[in-house]
């Protein structure tokens, strides 16, 4: 039976040394599931609420004891004897129990931990890997996603002068996920050598990418191109580039403040700036190119380059189906970033991905800068045919854990394993 017998939560640490919540669900048949909740650094203002204690005498106010207590008390009592195989019903019960629009009473971290742990428990009960169980819910074809590998960190993810948060390589020309992972790894090590040769730091940021103090944002792009060539790959053919601009972080009073370029730009000027980069570099994906409240700027960017570049809404959509619908209806962006903790339940996450597929928007399953060894997002990416995954660079075990899980899934699928490759960008013509 998949009836819930016990729910237990605890406070653990994430990859930045901050507390986060881990939940466990045990079923009547003894099957067991566990999930840990990630946490972001650059967050959208409309994200579901991550409940923190605020007690400055403990973990600098970042403890999650209240969220843990909510799981071990109200949530555990309410869901005891509930059928965990009814994922949609379970998540609806959690949402109703919280009773707020932003999950601020019990905490999205409390709800998400239980939601994901329940799915793990049911998969264990059915003796299925999580990706296989989830595919019975989504009814989607399974596919290995293109990894968007964040090899240079800036912005809120690093202590340097680079404004843009992530510079990524996408190995689209490879025949399998394992070959794509190898290509990314070789480029990562090549980049380390290039940085050393230029006398730059090879310290890494929150997501495992290097965080050198470049003089400008464009220097980061040029250095990556050098590393790609040195590793024996061809930029624009084997490897494409992606950016997470995270522009809400440097948007102030209607202007975009680029410290690296010493420029203060209007929305129109910043769209021109990004369009120039697209013309000069093999950039296939731009995330959060405009600020989350600059919908007019987003529309300008979409009209300007949206037919040839993937434009990803992260802070813009915050994995929220209601907000995402506004983007679809207005033709804003052409892809959505999927972060499970932005919305707070597995069901709502899957709903956002299904909406993207129906509207011919690409969906990219993503980690957060504060991660754990939990690998759930790898299984979600495969089970939903999301075609792309963002889970950081090629070092730090909290990032590599997801890549290793994808390798296991690829091996389990055997000859049926399909790598998205160049077909990953469903919203644009290639």
Swiss-Prot record:
- Which cofactor is recorded for it? Mg(2+)
The record's section on CDD domains has: enolase
Sorted alphabetically, the Gene Ontology cellular component annotations on this record are: cell surface; extracellular region; phosphopyruvate hydratase complex
Q: Which residues bind (2R)-2-phosphoglycerate?
A: 165, 339, 368-369, 390
Cofactor, free-text remark? Binds a second Mg(2+) ion via substrate during catalysis.
Q: Where in the cell is it found?
A: Cytoplasm; Secreted; Cell surface
| Pathway field | Carbohydrate degradation; glycolysis; pyruvate from D-glyceraldehyde 3-phosphate: step 4/5
Main localization of the protein described in the UniProt heading: cytoplasm
Q: What class of enzyme is it?
A: lyase
Q: Name one GO biological process term.
A: glycolytic process
Documented EC number(s): 4.2.1.11
Q: Give the matching Pfam families.
A: Enolase_C, Enolase_N
Superkingdom, taxonomy of origin = Bacteria
Which amino acid positions bind Mg(2+), per UniProt?
244, 287, 314
**PROSITE patterns tied to this protein:** ENOLASE (PS00164)
Q: Which reaction does it catalyse?
A: (2R)-2-phosphoglycerate = phosphoenolpyruvate + H2O
Mind telling me which SMART domains this protein's record contains? Enolase_C, Enolase_N
Q: What GO MF annotations does this protein's record show?
A: magnesium ion binding; phosphopyruvate hydratase activity
Q: Which InterPro entries does this entry report, sorted A to Z?
A: Enolase, Enolase-like_C_sf, Enolase-like_N, Enolase_C, Enolase_CS, Enolase_N
UniProt keyword terms in alphabetical order: Cytoplasm, Glycolysis, Lyase, Magnesium, Metal-binding, Secreted
Catalytic residues as annotated in Swiss-Prot or TrEMBL: 207, 339
Q: Which HAMAP family match?
A: Enolase
In the record, the note on similarity to other proteins reads: Belongs to the enolase family.
Subunit (UniProt):
Component of the RNA degradosome, a multiprotein complex involved in RNA processing and mRNA degradation.
Question: What task does this protein carry out?
Answer: Catalyzes the reversible conversion of 2-phosphoglycerate (2-PG) into phosphoenolpyruvate (PEP). It is essential for the degradation of carbohydrates via glycolysis.
* Name the UniProt record assigns to this protein: Enolase
* Annotated source species: Xanthomonas axonopodis pv. citri (strain 306)
Q: What is the lineage of its organism?
A: Bacteria, Pseudomonadati, Pseudomonadota, Gammaproteobacteria, Lysobacterales
Per the record, the gene is: eno
């Amino acid at each position: 039976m998949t009836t819930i017998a016990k729910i237990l939560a605890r406070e653990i640490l994430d990859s930045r040394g901050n507390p986060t919540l881990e939940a466990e669900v045990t079923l009547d048949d003894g099957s067991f599931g566990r999930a840990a909740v990630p946490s972001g650094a650059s967050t959208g203002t409309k994200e579901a609420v991550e409940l923190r204690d605020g007690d400055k005498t403990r973990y600098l106010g970042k403890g999650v004891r209240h969220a843990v207590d909510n799981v071990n008390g109200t949530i555990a009592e309410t869901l005891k004897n509930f059928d965990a195989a009814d994922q949609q019903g379970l998540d609806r019960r959690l949402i109703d129990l919280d009773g707020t629009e932003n999950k601020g009473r019990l905490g999205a971290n409390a709800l998400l931990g239980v939601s994901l742990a329940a799915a793990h428990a049911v998969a264990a009960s059915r003796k299925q890997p999580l990706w296989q169980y989830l595919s019975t819910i989504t009814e989607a074809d399974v596919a290995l996603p293109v990894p968007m590998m964040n090899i240079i960190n800036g912005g809120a993810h690093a202590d340097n002068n680079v404004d843009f948060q992530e510079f990524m390589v996408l190995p689209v020309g490879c025949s399998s996920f394992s070959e794509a992972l190898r290509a990314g790894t070789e480029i990562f090590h090549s980049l380390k050598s290039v940085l050393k040769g230029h006398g730059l730091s090879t310290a890494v940021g929150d997501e495992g990418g290097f965080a050198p103090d470049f003089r400008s944002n464009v220097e980061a792009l040029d250095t990556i191109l050098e590393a790609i060539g040195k590793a024996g790959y061809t930029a624009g053919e084997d490897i494409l580039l992606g950016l997470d601009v995270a522009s809400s972080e440097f948007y102030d009073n209607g202007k975009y403040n680029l410290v690296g370029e010493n420029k203060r730009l209007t929305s129109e000027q910043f769209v021109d700036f990004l369009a120039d980069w697209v013309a000069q570099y093999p950039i296939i994906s731009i995330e959060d190119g405009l600020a989350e409240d600059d919908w007019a700027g987003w529309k300008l960017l979409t009209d300007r380059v949206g037919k040839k570049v993937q434009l990803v809404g992260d802070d813009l959509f915050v994995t929220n189906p209601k907000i995402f619908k506004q983007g679809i209806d207005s033709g804003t962006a052409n892809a959505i970033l999927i972060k499970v903790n932005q919305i707070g339940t597995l069901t709502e996450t899957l709903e956002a991905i299904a909406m993207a597929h129906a509207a011919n928007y690409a969906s990219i399953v993503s980690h957060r800068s504060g991660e754990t060894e939990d690998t759930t997002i790898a299984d979600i990416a495969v089970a939903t045919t999301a075609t792309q995954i963002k889970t950081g660079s090629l070092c730090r075990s909290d990032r590599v854990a997801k890549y290793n899980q994808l390798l296991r899934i690829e091996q389990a699928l055997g000859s049926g394993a399909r790598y998205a490759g160049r077909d990953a960008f469903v919203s644009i013509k290639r």
